[in-house]
């Protein structure tokens, strides 16, 4: 008999932390969980030992989580006494959250990346840093979720979530988008952004001019529908060709990369001792392309005309093979190499004149 004991599988909230270039660190947070703050401190200290002087904090696609964790993270970047967020409702007295003196990165250059998938706790962090003139916000308008809800459990196991208050940024703006129309209209709002061109053009961003606020540094910010970035970066629909997208989402590229890495593991690990060596030197050659073509034929991927010259193919294969050898330490740096928002963040951090915060 074989006894199998289930092990604990940790779910991390920091996807990756690495140096984009000398002096500039990058940390991507996917959710605000109970362990996020401790994970951040570890990642921050690791990057500091590698010489990090400036930071890119990636909150894109981060749907939120615990308020406490968002406050702890924002506190790392704000000086003692500065307001982070406050909550208030008709029957919910105003409660203000302020920064303490424990922040470890209060004076260095900081960029925060957001997009339409950044919500709730992500918006609390981005809003606090924007309103205090502490960070340059880059990307696209965030989701717009700023409600405080209390959960009431019912006898049948279901629950009711009752809205009791709203979150407000330090300047007093609500980040909650309107929900005075139908429920369908509320949930379709993100699709409307796509239809109206907001994901591709900064001029198409809908802002309520009646809800203008001024930061201490004199910057105009808007309430009533998410965080509007200081620097807009459009959605990139051309990063990968349609063929590459089809092969990727079908799982064929993942399975090929897994088999390739497994078959050549000893050779590859002998040649590339570390993730940085793999990132800088591993390339996709003609033999590998022919192997993939044969693999696709064996999997009967009918209708897919693959040449190996498709946009993004080499990049995504390198990233997938790298993930099988070095996990996220190779996967994300390769995948992010031509990420428009990250490239813009690096450009801003290199050029002090582009930083939108008041020193």
Cite the ranges covered by each PLM segment:
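Conserved functional hotspot residues or short segments at active or partner-binding sites
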Residues: 174-175, 179-359
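Cleft-lining beta-strand/loop regions that shape enzyme active-site pockets
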Residues: 1-157
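Generic recognition of long tandem-repeat/solenoid scaffolds
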Residues: 27, 161-162, 222
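Short, solvent-exposed loop/turn elements at domain surfaces
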Residues: 11-13, 35-38, 170-171, 221-223, ...
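Polar, glycine-rich mid-to-C-terminal structural blocks
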Residues: 121, 133-134, 140, 144-211
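Residue-level structural signal for beta-strand termini and adjacent loop
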Residues: 4-5, 90, 165, 180, ...
């Amino acid at each position: 008999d074989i006894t199998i004991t289930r092990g604990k599988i940790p779910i991390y909230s920091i996807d990756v932390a690495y140096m984009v270039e000398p002096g500039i660190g990058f940390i991507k947070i996917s959710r605000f969980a109970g362990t996020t703050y401790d994970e951040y401190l570890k990642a921050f200290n690791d990057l500091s030992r590698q010489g990090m002087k400036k930071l890119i904090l990636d909150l894109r696609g981060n749907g939120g989580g615990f308020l406490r964790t968002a406050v702890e993270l924002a506190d790392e970047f704000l000086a003692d006494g500065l307001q982070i967020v406050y909550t208030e409702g008709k029957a919910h007295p105003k409660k203000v959250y302020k920064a303490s003196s424990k922040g470890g990165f209060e004076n260095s250059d900081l960029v925060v990346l957001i997009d339409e998938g950044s919500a709730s706790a992500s918006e609390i962090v981005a809003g606090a840093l924007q309103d205090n003139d502490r960070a340059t916000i880059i990307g696209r308008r965030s989701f717009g979720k700023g409600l405080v809800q209390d959960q009431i459990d019912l006898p049948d196991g279901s629950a009711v979530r009752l809205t009791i208050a709203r979150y407000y940024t330090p300047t007093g703006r609500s980040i909650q988008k309107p929900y005075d129309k139908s429920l369908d209209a509320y949930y379709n709002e993100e699709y409307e952004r796509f239809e109206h061109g907001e994901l591709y053009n900064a001029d198409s961003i809908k802002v309520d001019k009646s809800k203008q606020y001024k930061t201490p540094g004199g910057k105009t910010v808007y309430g009533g529908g998410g965080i509007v970035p200081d620097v807009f970066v459009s959605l990139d629909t051309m990063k990968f060709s349609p063929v590459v997208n089809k092969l990727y989402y079908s799982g064929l590229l993942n399975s090929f990369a897994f088999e390739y890495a497994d078959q050549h593991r000893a050779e590859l690990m002998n040649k590339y001792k570390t993730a940085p060596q793999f990132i800088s030197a591993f390339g996709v050659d003609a033999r590998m392309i022919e192997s993939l073509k044969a693999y696709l034929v064996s999997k009967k991927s009918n209708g897919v005309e693959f040449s190996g010259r498709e946009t993004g193919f080499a990049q995504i294969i390198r990233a997938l093979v790298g993930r099988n050898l070095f996990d996220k330490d190779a996967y994300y740096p390769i995948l992010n190499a031509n990420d428009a928002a990250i490239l813009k963040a690096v450009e801003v951090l290199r050029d002090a004149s582009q930083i939108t915060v008041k020193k």
